[in-house]
């Protein structure tokens, strides 16, 4: 994030044009001074780091999934799909997830995205790209609020 560099892959030329326009409009189209060298180093020498990161994220996912299975079984966790963002099905709570997310923030001090932001009504989205200790603490807070 500090390097202000990212890859966006869009096969459709029209979608690419729309993305390019948004990048320019939001002043996100220029790389900073270190970005090019950092990207070259990451692609050429980052394989081992990436493998370890993916392993750690998978272990975080397993930790979260097992936690929900044991402590919050009414809230199924969706299978992970090439990301560090986990979707939790909250439809059994029969409450809007905007309300659940607000309660988690106010009572548990856990900031979670509600699915409505992403056309996922009834789901919460949890970011697992964090130290396991942080994840464990956040999950325990979630359990105390909604469990």
Name each model feature, range by range:
Residues 1-147:
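PLP-dependent class I/II
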């Amino acid at each position: 994030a500090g390097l202000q560099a990212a890859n966006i892959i869009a096969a459709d030329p029209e979608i690419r044009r729309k993305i390019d326009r948004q990048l320019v409009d939001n002043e996100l189209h220029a790389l900073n001074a270190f970005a090019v060298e950092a990207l070259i180093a990451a692609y050429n020498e980052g394989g081992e780091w990436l493998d370890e990161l993916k392993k750690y994220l998978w272990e975080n996912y397993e930790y979260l999934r097992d936690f929900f299975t044991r402590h919050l079984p009414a809230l199924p966790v969706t299978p992970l799909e090439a990301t560090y963002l986990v979707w939790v099905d909250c439809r059994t709570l029969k409450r809007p997830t905007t309300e659940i997310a607000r309660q988690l923030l106010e009572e548990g001090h856990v900031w979670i995205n509600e699915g409505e932001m992403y056309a996922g009504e009834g789901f919460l989205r949890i970011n697992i790209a964090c130290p396991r200790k942080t994840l464990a603490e956040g999950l325990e807070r979630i359990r105390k609020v909604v469990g």
